[in-house]
Every structure is written in structure tokens, then in C-alpha cells.
A protein has these predicted regions:
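Active-site-proximal alpha-helix that buttresses catalytic centers in soluble enzyme cores
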Residues: 2-83, 126-127, 223, 234
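A short, structured active-site edge motif that brings together acidic residues
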Residues: 74-90, 134-137
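Domain-level recognition of soluble alpha/beta enzyme cores
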Residues: 122-158
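NUDIX/MutT-family hydrolases
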Residues: 141-144, 161-167, 270, 280-314
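Active-site-adjacent beta-strand/loop module that shapes the phosphate/pyrophosphate-binding cleft
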Residues: 247, 256-280, 292-294
Length: 326
């Protein structure tokens, strides 16, 4: 046995929303379950070198949550429609097309397909636990595989273990997988970045503020730093999503601040961002927020986060100084 197949069933889905099955979202419980499996894989150094997922909402989000916790690039997950509502034959075909270089593959999908594939590879019926579920939601099956992903026959695999997220710690180690401190969310959630978007109009600086997701106050783009990106690149990603802007993020931080969330302190690094492109209103996915260009004084007056006020003032002075040198 030279390779390993990791079969992960999606996390617990949310049936409260009236949506088609393909678009059914995860519950928060389902997201945490996926992250616990990811942490377990990281702790045992079982990170996959190839990830393929059903594109159904509950499956791809499960894949992303698990992969991010391991510090891997969620954008590199391969999505394959055949995994959704799949027969064993479909899943075998997906595996047959796996890159030859892949030694450990993570496939994220659904039942009954994953259970059927597990028994096919084991070559026999697998005794069920007391609850009658072989692979319930947010559960991982580890299967040792032969050296070739193609032409897999019954009995070619060996089921090594089945890990349920429900059996793992409810909290997450911080700041690394071997730490004893436990927190409510994965470690990377507490490392965040933000940008203050600006432009020069008629020789004067203007700053772009957006409304918070619940439209209660004015903010600048901020979010969890993606583990595989730099703080600046993560902040640029948030700016595109939350404010509908693209531009150049400065290499030097304007400062940082901390705030309480998820039972601990989150640290936020703040960067200047020169806006080069404003996404048209009808193409901006979060246009419900609203956005507005403001003078430095207006931005300082409106911004909710007190720690950002001196940073806006600092950036305005920096821009004025640059102007005077020209």
C-alpha cells in the first residue's frame, strides 16, 4: 500500500432554509466539524497533496474549512460534479483521473456514495457501530491504497480508521496544533488584516468607507487572514469582497489594534490601499452595504472603530507630505 485516500463526508447541513439540495448550506456546527477534522489531519501530519470535492454548497464549504485549517490554499481545491449524487463507478472514475503525483488524496462528498466506495475498496461489508452509521456527517475515513489510482478493484484498499468530528475536542489549539491553550475558533481566525482604501481627487485625499454587514455603522474592509496569503493579500481580498475595490496595498502597516471576539483577542494589522479600480455597483456582490468617498475629517468622524481614527489621520498626513514633495 503506497498511497492514501481520505474520504470526508460534508458537515451537518442546514435544513431550515428552503433551497434546492445542491445549494443547501452548512450549519455552524457543520463548519466547526470540518475544521476539527482539518486540525486532526494537521496534528497527525496527514495533509493531503490533492483535494477534490463535490461542488454542492455543503461539500465545497466543508472542503474549504478543512483545508484552510491545515494552512493550504482553498482556491486549489478541484471541484467535480460527478461526486454529487455519485455511484461507486462515478467516484472510481474521479479517482482514476487523480494526478499521478498525488500520494494522499482528500475527497469530500456525500452518502450513500462515500460509504459504498469505502466498502467497495475494503472488499466486504463493514460492521456498523451502535448508531448504525458508518460515515455520518463530518466524518473521515482513512483508506490505504495501491500505487495506482486507476482500475481499482474490490478489496484493493484497506480501511485504517474512521474519525468522527464529534469525537474530537470541541475547541481548537492556539497558536499551533501542539499547543495546550484551546480557543473557540481555529488559530488563524485571530490573525486579521484590514485596509484603509484611498484615492487622490483634485489633488486631495479621499477615503472609502463601507457600512458593516448589518448596516449599523461605517467601517473599512477587514477580515480573517487566509493562512496561505500574506496579510496584505488577505486584506486586498477583503477589500474586493466588502468594498468592491481593487488596488495597491502598501507594504508598511499603518498600525494595529485588538478587539475581543470568539472568547479571546483578535489582532488586526491595518494597511493603506490606493484604489485603482472601483467595481461597478451592479457587479459588486455586497452592494447592500453601501459605500462612500469621504474627506479625511469626514472619515474620522464616521468610522466606528476608535483605533482607526488616528490611522486615517496618519495616512492623510503621509499623503499630504508626498504631495508637497512633488
Amino acid at each position: 500500500m503506497a498511497r492514501e485516500l481520505l474520504l470526508l463526508r460534508h458537515g451537518k447541513s442546514d435544513w431550515s432554509e428552503q433551497v434546492e439540495d445542491f445549494k443547501r448550506p452548512l450549519k455552524d456546527r457543520g463548519k466547526r466539524g470540518a475544521q476539527r477534522i482539518g486540525v486532526w489531519l494537521l496534528q497527525y501530519q496527514l495533509q493531503p497533496d490533492y483535494v477534490v470535492s463535490s461542488p454542492a454548497e455543503r461539500a465545497i464549504i466543508t472542503a474549504q474549512k478543512a483545508v484552510k485549517v491545515m494552512g493550504q490554499d482553498a482556491d486549489k481545491i478541484t471541484q467535480d460534479r460527478r461526486i454529487y449524487a455519485a455511484r461507486v463507478e462515478d467516484l472510481l472514475q474521479v479517482l482514476a483521473e487523480t494526478p499521478k503525483s498525488a500520494k494522499r488524496v482528500l475527497m469530500v462528498g456525500h452518502n450513500p456514495g462515500l460509504e459504498a466506495l469505502t466498502e467497495y475498496l475494503e472488499g466486504k461489508r463493514i460492521p456498523l457501530p451502535k448508531d448504525g452509521k458508518l460515515i455520518p456527517t463530518a466524518t473521515l475515513a482513512r483508506i490505504s491504497m495501491p500505487n495506482d489510482w486507476k482500475k481499482l478493484r474490490p478489496g484493493d484498499g484497506k480501511l485504517d480508521s474512521i474519525i468522527r468530528a464529534s469525537s474530537l475536542d470541541k475547541k481548537f489549539p492556539f497558536p499551533d496544533p501542539t499547543s495546550k491553550e484551546m480557543r473557540d475558533r481555529p488559530a488563524y481566525y485571530y490573525n486579521q488584516s484590514s485596509v484603509i482604501p484611498y484615492r487622490i481627487k483634485d489633488g486631495k485625499p479621499e477615503f472609502l468607507l463601507v457600512r458593516s454587514s448589518k448596516q449599523k455603522h461605517w467601517v473599512v474592509p477587514k477580515g480573517i487572514s487566509e493562512p496561505w496569503l500574506t496579510l496584505q493579500a488577505s486584506a486586498a481580498k477583503e477589500a474586493f469582497e466588502e468594498a468592491g475595490v481593487e488596488g495597491d496595498v502598501g507594504s508598511e502597516s499603518l498600525g494595529s489594534y485588538k478587539y475581543e471576539k470568539w472568547g479571546a483577542e483578535c489582532s488586526v494589522q491595518v494597511y493603506p490601499m490606493l484604489v485603482k479600480n472601483l467595481i461597478p455597483e451592479d457587479e459588486w456582490e455586497e452592494r447592500h452595504r453601501g459605500r462612500e468617498w469621504l474627506s479625511p475629517d469626514e472619515a474620522i468622524e464616521r468610522i466606528k472603530q476608535a483605533e482607526l481614527k488616528p490611522m486615517i489621520k496618519k495616512l492623510a498626513k503621509m499623503l499630504e507630505k508626498q504631495k508637497s514633495k512633488k
